[in-house]
UniProtKB/Swiss-Prot annotation:
Domain of life of the native organism: Viruses
Protein name (Swiss-Prot/TrEMBL): Protein P1
Organism from which the protein derives: Rice tungro bacilliform virus (isolate Philippines)
Species lineage: Viruses, Riboviria, Pararnavirae, Artverviricota, Revtraviricetes
């Protein structure tokens, strides 16, 4: 199994259990746990459950690509808001079961309405975030289209380079182009990974 796939599977298997997800490019002083990278962009993922206050639980994401940054920001905000939804729904369901067995008191009804309003607000927020996420992902598709166009232009430029330059220079250019194509391939894999995380 490719190393990249193992890393992705590990991240996916732990994603729902996280209190928060922090994405950053680390310096030498930090221990690297997870890494997805090309020569131009690196994704370092680490998980820190020791931070408890909201102000401490911040992520940093460094990339020259603003579209990727915006997508990651939305994913982080989305997971922050929805991490307790399942627990809230379970409590709500248990509370409703008890209500069915008892004649509701005013206090129980008030508690029921309080929970219902909280859950409703959370789901409204989720819908809003999903809408923003979909918009950013559509921008990513446009980025992929640009990458495809660039690759076609590179392929079409190769014969001209061979005609105009010596064989040695052409071989050097070919290696550089292959390296660049691999970098683009890695970037597209990262885009697919982010799309998968967002669904």
């Amino acid at each position: 199994v490719p190393k990249r796939d193992l890393i992705s599977q590990n991240i996916e298997s732990r994603y729902e259990k996280l209190e928060f997800l922090d994405l950053a490019v680390w310096g030498k002083e930090k221990k690297q746990k997870y890494l997805l990278s090309t020569d131009n962009i690196s994704f370092y993922c680490y998980f820190d459950t020791s931070k408890t206050s909201e102000s401490e639980r911040k992520h940093t994401f460094h990339s020259d690509n603003k579209q990727l940054n915006s997508i990651v920001d939305l994913i982080i905000k989305h997971s922050e808001k929805t991490k307790n939804i399942k627990e809230e729904l379970e409590k709500y369901s248990q509370f409703l079961d008890k209500i069915l067995d008892l004649k509701p008191t005013k206090k129980q009804v008030e508690k029921l309405l309080e929970n219902q309003n909280l859950i409703s607000k959370n789901f409204d927020y989720i819908k809003e975030q999903n809408t923003q996420l979909e918009k950013s992902l559509r921008k990513t598709v446009k980025l992929e289209d640009s990458i495809n166009t660039l690759l076609v232009e590179i392929q079409q430029a190769r014969p001209k380079e061979v005609e105009l330059r010596t064989l040695k220079i052409a071989e050097q250019n070919s290696k550089a182009i292959e390296k660049f194509e691999q970098e683009i391939k890695d970037l597209r894999e990262i885009l697919e990974f982010l799309k998968h995380q967002a669904t």
